[in-house]
Amino acid sequence: VKVRVYSFWIAFRGAWRNIPAHMKRIIPFLAFLLMAAGVLAADTRCYELRIYSANEGKLEALNVRFRDHTCKLFEKHGLTNVGYWVPVDKTDSRLIYVISSPNRAAHAKSWKAFLNDPDWKKAYANSIKDGRLVGKIDSTFLNATDYSPTVKPVIPKDIRMFELRTVTTAPDRLKNLHARFRDHTCEIFENQGMTNVAYWTPMDEKKGKSNTLIYIISHMSKKQSGDRLEITKWNLDQA
């Protein structure tokens, strides 16, 4: 949205003096309409939530591999690094992250290119010389809901706690849950000092397309329930 509006103003900046007065009065209004249209546009990107369960003692090495190699290679092949987290509970050796791409077909193409990249193959081989880093991988493809904030990488000004929450509804009740979040819950979260980060539903039925809401909120306090996560420090530096 910002790029579209910025380009609009750059196009007119050089010739501003030659624009009729009545046009000058409506240009800001047109710019507002462009911004409004962008805000209302649906987020059609493909998101992938990936959860890696690291083998015993291997989480730090896994973080190093992502920090030094994987994140850069993702971007090289068209995959956007959205966020990386580790659980607050230090006995939980999972790395949880979200990547995105324009659509699922593009996502699959980018992932294949990433796996076939010689730099990735070299980094992977070097990282497992003392044993494999990951014991289990869980992947869920996601669509953003119509009430989700714009999902984008950010550099938090303060250390925050994050909650990854999954809600499973009774049959045919997901639309009611969406209505409650859209009309009430998201606003109440913000009023209570929580930040709405992202809201998604799975793309695939086997992952809960018809009855599952997955969302992330953040807090300034650790005194919250749920699956609490810390954003990885190396992601703060690179986001």
What are these regions (language model features)?
Residues V1-S7:
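Short, low-complexity, charge-dense intrinsically disordered segments
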Residues K24-R25, K121:
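Short secondary-structure capping/junction motifs at helix and strand boundaries
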